[in-house]
Amino acid sequence: MGKIIQLQEEERLRQGKNLLGFSGGVDSTALFFLLLEREIPFDIALVNYHQRAQAKEEESYAKELAHRHQKRCFTLSCPLGPSNFEHQARLERYRFFESLIHQEGYARLLLAHHLGDRLEWLLMRLAQGSSLSTLLGFSSREIRLGYELIRPLGEITKEALYDYLHQHQIRYFEDESNRDPKPLRNRFRPLSETLLKEHAQGLLQSFRFLQEEREILYGEDPRIRRDSLFYFPSQERETQNLHLIDLSLKALGYVMSQGERQELLKSGFCVVLKGKVAIGRSERGIFIAPFERVIIPKAQRERLRIAKIPPKVRPYCFMAGIDSLL
């Protein structure tokens, strides 16, 4: 008999409709069946990037599971090139999920990140240099524009998920890219797995303590998000502003170096980072968005100015059809 897996925010999941980001891998497949066991209402969404030979089979498996268990299954075909794949895949994935959430009336998005993912992130950030604001990575619950993002497996090891699937003889797919030694995360994975085998409870308790301390230090998240635009009112302390910018950049797949943090402070929070991300500040607050080069027609440019959206962020707002604050 395997250990009973406790889902975080379980009672909250029973309130309203849930959308599960599904891939057919160990994590999301385990979460699929754990939600079924608890009779928590959910549907699934899968993005097929056509990067792996088994991608078509994974999509078929998702549709089969959904049909068998009377769930809706939304799929998106999204071929991407190899350049900056992880970043682009993340943007497309969240764009797809959020469009479904708003169109179909889901209350929350469920993702299957687990304790190993949290430890890998922490190790990477320690190696690269990080403050507490970005050291912990994701939280079990985040408030987004119009929905909640919840990670029910945030305190569960991947080993426990394997045990659960094997015990119940549930089919799943292994992501071949996890064995690629090029991504930094994959190089930390063997160390993370060893640490969790020997010190899982101690590491989990440390994450809980650090999370509590981060909440005391930085308070609640005041950010508003629309597509890939983040906005929040300027905070009293610059450390709070930096923390919220760090979180927003992470969501866009970008992690600032120490030099870039200094540049950001010197600029008064008005800078473009490596031609990828634009940060601007106005009397309305601080804005973060992907950097775009586009000529904005005069009428739209004036609307963005009146809305007090900073110049460096305006091209993205124009491209995304955002001409006022929410």
From Swiss-Prot:
GO terms for molecular function: ATP binding; tRNA(Ile)-lysidine synthase activity. ATP binds at residues 23-28. One of its GO terms (cellular component) is cytoplasm. Its EC number is 6.3.4.19. Keywords: ATP-binding, Cytoplasm, Ligase, Nucleotide-binding, tRNA processing. Gene3D superfamilies: HUPs (3.40.50.620). One of its GO terms (biological process) is tRNA modification. It comes from the Bacteria. It catalyses: cytidine(34) in tRNA(Ile2) + L-lysine + ATP = lysidine(34) in tRNA(Ile2) + AMP + diphosphate + H(+). It is found in: Cytoplasm. Pfam families: ATP_bind_3 (PF01171). HAMAP family: tRNA_Ile_lys_synt. Belongs to the tRNA(Ile)-lysidine synthase family. The N-terminal region contains the highly conserved SGGXDS motif, predicted to be a P-loop motif involved in ATP binding. NCBIfam families: lysidine_TilS_N. Ligates lysine onto the cytidine present at position 34 of the AUA codon-specific tRNA(Ile) that contains the anticodon CAU, in an ATP-dependent manner. Cytidine is converted to lysidine, thus changing the amino acid specificity of the tRNA from methionine to isoleucine. This is tRNA(Ile)-lysidine synthase. It comes from Wolinella succinogenes (strain ATCC 29543 / DSM 1740 / CCUG 13145 / JCM 31913 / LMG 7466 / NCTC 11488 / FDC 602W) (Vibrio succinogenes). The lineage of its organism: Bacteria, Pseudomonadati, Campylobacterota, Epsilonproteobacteria, Campylobacterales.
